[in-house]
Amino acid sequence: MSDVVVREGRAGDGPALRRLLAEAMGEPDTDAIRPDDPGNVVFVAELGGHPAGYAAARVDGAVLVVDRVMVAPADRGRHVGHRLLDWLEGYGVSRGLQRVRIAVERENRPARDFYARRGYAACDDGVERDLPHV
């Protein structure tokens, strides 16, 4: 896992993240990737200096609402998703948040299974879990 480097997103990351999204999903949702929006937090995972995935979230009360976790198809199975979740959860804990909620489609069985292995339970629009209190 040590070759995956995660960092906070920067304003200049938008084009590269949109390319990743287009590669994985066909059409990029340009509104979903806004590292320059002060209401969003974006974490970028890199492998060998290239973007391998990202997570986009926002705080809603005591909940970190994760709108998207995306890993490039070529980089799946290389612990990119685990590292992004580690960063999301650490961000939530460091801000005293109580829960993480991740949007994931019901039909996306591989993602739901991945989150279940990480302790997330199904909820109305995705999965969620409580954060530890430090």
Model features per residue range: what roles?
Residues 71, 77-90, 113-117:
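Conserved acetyl-CoA-binding loop-helix of GNAT-fold acetyltransferases
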Residues 2-3, 42-43, 98-134:
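C-terminal "cap" of GNAT-fold acetyltransferases
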Residues 78, 95-98:
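Short coil/turn segments at alpha/beta junctions that flank glycine-rich nucleotide-binding fingerprints
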Residues 2-4, 8-67, 72, 85-86, ...:
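Acetyl-CoA-dependent GNAT
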